[in-house]
């Protein structure tokens, strides 16, 4: 596709689910977008198996972008990402795993990738409601374009995965990126507990607890966190590695 794409292209984009007739087109697009070769069974699954959310963005009838994701129970998360959610979440808590998100080169920077990602979020909110606590994906450590895209949409690096990919016989490193939704969060670290306690103490009036105890606790926490004023903490920011 080499046509000049107008700035108003997004207004002409339609969304629809992938179907079996799209297999050849999807194979061609994935060959252009990704260095990984997928088996034929993968293409059959994402275009017919209802466990996948497979959405195409079309422009004047042609597929110009797509997103494929699987919404599954946290018990089905692979071992390397098993700590995406804290252990206190129930076993029927769900996560959404993005297998693929791509846009035809000429149509990039027109908001189509964002539209597809937002459509996944909308789908989760209507089907999984608040049971889905995280959206995650894997990306090559060298894919700066994709990394910037996800980081600009509040995904956080959760894990570094050495030798995660095998591309044409060469092992490549990957990252796991996660977006927490509906109150989802990773396991807390010691620092998280300290920050949370600091926030709670800072919200108390010294008159409500013995003044000496308050001052000692406040000084102790400041010694752990010399770079930040505890009184300014209003919450916890989670960040890990993909």
Curated annotation (Swiss-Prot):
Outcome of swapping residue 140 to A: Decreased acetyltransferase activity
Family matches, as PROSITE patterns: GNAT (PS51186)
Post-translational modification, as annotated: Acetylated: autoacetylation is required for optimal acetyltransferase activity.
Binding site for substrate: 38, 99, 165
Resulting phenotype, residue 131 to Y: In IBGC9; uncertain significance; decreased activity of N-terminal protein amino acid acetylation; when transfected RPE-1 cells, does not affect subcellular localization to the Golgi apparatus
Active site: 97, 138
Result of altering residue 81 to A: Slightly increased acetyltransferase activity
Entry's localization field: Golgi apparatus membrane
One GO term (biological process): nucleosome assembly
Keywords: Acetylation, Acyltransferase, Chromatin regulator, Chromosome partition, Golgi apparatus, Membrane, Transferase
Effect noted on mutating residue 19 to S: Does not affect localization to the Golgi apparatus
Domain named N-acetyltransferase: residues: 13-182
Binding site for acetyl-CoA: 101-103, 109-114, 143, 150-153
Site entry: Required to position thioacetyl group: 34
Induction: Isoform 2: Imprinted. Promoter methylation of the paternal allele may restrict expression to the maternal allele in placenta and leukocytes. Isoform 1: Biallelically expressed.
Enzyme Commission designation: 2.3.1.259, 2.3.1.48
UniProt effect for mutating residue 79 to A: Slightly reduced acetyltransferase activity
Residues on Cytoplasmic side: 1-192, 237-242
Phenotype for residue 17 to R: In IBGC9; uncertain significance; when transfected RPE-1 cells, does not affect subcellular localization to the Golgi apparatus
Listed result of changing residue 36 to A: Reduced acetyltransferase activity
Chain positions covered by the region annotation Required for homodimerization: 162-173
The family this protein is said to belong to: Belongs to the acetyltransferase family. NAA60 subfamily.
PANTHER family recorded: N-ALPHA-ACETYLTRANSFERASE 60
Role description: N-alpha-acetyltransferase that specifically mediates the acetylation of N-terminal residues of the transmembrane proteins, with a strong preference for N-termini facing the cytosol. Displays N-terminal acetyltransferase activity towards a range of N-terminal sequences including those starting with Met-Lys, Met-Val, Met-Ala and Met-Met. Required for normal chromosomal segregation during anaphase. May also show histone acetyltransferase activity; such results are however unclear in vivo and would require additional experimental evidences.
Protein name: N-alpha-acetyltransferase 60
Organism annotation: Homo sapiens (Human)
């Amino acid at each position: 596709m080499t046509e000049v794409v107008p700035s108003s292209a997004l207004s002409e984009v339609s969304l629809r689910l992938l179907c079996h007739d799209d297999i050849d087109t999807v194979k061609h697009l994935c060959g252009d977008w990704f260095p990984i070769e997928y088996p034929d069974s993968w293409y059959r699954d994402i275009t017919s198996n209802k466990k996948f959310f497979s959405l195409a963005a079309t422009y004047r009838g042609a597929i110009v972008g797509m997103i494929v994701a699987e919404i599954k129970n946290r018990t089905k998360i692979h071992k390397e990402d098993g700590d995406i959610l804290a252990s206190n979440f129930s076993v029927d808590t769900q996560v959404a795993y993005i297998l693929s998100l791509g846009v035809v080169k000429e149509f990039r920077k027109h908001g189509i990738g964002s539209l597809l990602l937002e459509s996944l979020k909308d789908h989760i909110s209507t089907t999984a409601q608040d049971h889905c606590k995280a959206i995650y994906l894997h990306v090559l450590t060298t894919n700066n374009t994709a990394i910037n895209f996800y980081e600009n949409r509040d995904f956080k690096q959760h894990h570094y995965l050495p030798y995660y990919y095998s591309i044409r016989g060469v092992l490549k490193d990957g990252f796991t990126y996660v977006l927490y939704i509906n109150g989802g969060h990773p396991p807390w670290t010691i620092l998280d507990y300290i920050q949370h306690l600091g926030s709670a103490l800072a919200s108390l009036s010294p008159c409500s607890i013995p003044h000496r105890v308050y001052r000692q606790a406040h000084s102790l926490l400041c010694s752990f966190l010399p770079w930040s004023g505890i009184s300014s903490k209003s919450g916890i920011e989670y960040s890990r590695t993909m």
